[in-house]
């Protein structure tokens, strides 16, 4: 398995992390802005190259940290949603 990250220079509040395994790219995107948004989805096929074009390789530990941030944010967002 390979791990990557990419930051949007135009929007530094967006952080993107990817893991590539078995021809599928798992994308974890964290947006820190007025509303924190977390996206977690998979991409297959030719689109993978587009996503990895400006990405740099990272280690598993860094990717796992991004996953743990997402897990914590999802818990917080769910809690806030159900307690409005």
Residue ranges and their predicted role:
Residues 56-84:
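Charged interaction segments
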Residues 2-9:
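A short beta-strand micro-motif
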Residues 12-66:
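Acidic, low-complexity, intrinsically disordered interaction modules
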